[in-house]
Amino acid sequence: MELIKPQQKVVSPEYLLFEAPRTKAFITGSEAASEAVKRANVDIAIAYPITPQSETMQRVGDLFGQGYIRDYYRAEDEVGAFSAISGASRTGVRCMTASSGPGLMRGIEVIASWPGHRVPLVFLIMCRVINAPLSIQPDNQELDYMISSGNIVFHAENHQDFFDWTLAGFIISEKCEVTLPVAVAVDGFFVTHARGWVEMPSSDLKLPMRDCYREAVPMIDNENPPIRIARDAPIQKSNFISYQMHASWQQEIHAAQERSRRWISKYLNGLVEVVNPGAEIMIVASGSAVSQSREALLQAEAMGHRIGLVKIKSLRPFPVEELREACKNAKRIIVPEFNCSGWLNREIRATLYNHSQAEITPGPRVFGGITMPTELILQWIFQDAEYCR
């Protein structure tokens, strides 16, 4: 029996994200991601299962069975999945994949090649601990690797972000002056397997198809070699021409990231969100640490203290000017993180060097799957373990 494909109306990205009526649903983060894919007019999805990503891609597979996606398959491993999705993107179709922790690390060689080949796609990351020892618990250490890979990287706080930013990722990735992969990360389990309220437009609406003839690198057809490196073979030689070509490609990726800022500002409503601007004590965080920081902020206000909060939405490109403006009056800055290396603290210190006199406190920092109680954040704010008891 022939599959009856669902009838969806193509609407503009602006209408879908900002104007269409929305209804609220109490769903998991995995469901939120798949609901975004349902409305994204995706041509192909390829992935290899790994906890906590597996449920999302299982649901995306269901969308294929229902006719919302044109093609879908499970790859033999992460290297195969990421290589195949790159090849699919080169043919001019809209693509997405996903992974977590060790799976991402296994395929990092391919992931780092995407930006240089200028392949637009969306990569969903459900963050988890990187082995060893083995753990499937939430921890976003893998983002330390992603922010140096050339990909555009968003770090979602909650279910609503995960839904909206996944849709926005397809739009931004395919802009002619961008033409880069967009990674949308969320902290595993805290969001993927927990339920939260998400406002969504009707599933009868979808994005326009990818316009592959309006991008920085042409798609594969009968007149274009199959991959960019085949057209630029001298880069494989050991001479000054190859050195210059490689350097220019790196500059090209950086420039494309910089050009993406205006689209991120438009579709994510800014690269940062600032609560209580001008406060002398500021919390700067991304991902699930933002949610915990919001609660700590409310508890501090109940005790008579005005604390500010900067939510970092985009890790690449990093909101340099926005962060400097938000922290210009700060005397102390707290950086809570769900990882052991403190990659966000490092970014903030580099950004504010010679632009702020604030004392930057590198923590609290939890990892390996442990939660971050608001009391812990308050202890770091007030530098007193007894203060918030």
Model features per residue range: what roles?
Residues 28-32, 258-281, 294, 298:
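Glycine-/acidic-rich phosphate or pyrophosphate-binding loops and their flanking alpha/beta elements
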Residues 153-214, 332, 338, 375-389:
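Structural signature of the thiamine diphosphate
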Residues 293-326:
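Generic long, charged, amphipathic alpha-helical segments
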Residues 54, 103-106, 128-132, 161-162, ...:
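Short gly/pro/ser/thr-enriched loop/turn and capping motifs at secondary-structure boundaries
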Residues 134-136, 252-269, 284-292, 312-319:
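A general structural motif
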Residues 336-389:
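Peripheral docking tails and interdomain loops at the edges
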Residues 1-145, 150-151, 167, 187, ...:
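Thiamine diphosphate
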Residues 3, 181-273:
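Conformationally flexible catalytic loops at phosphate/diphosphate-handling active centers
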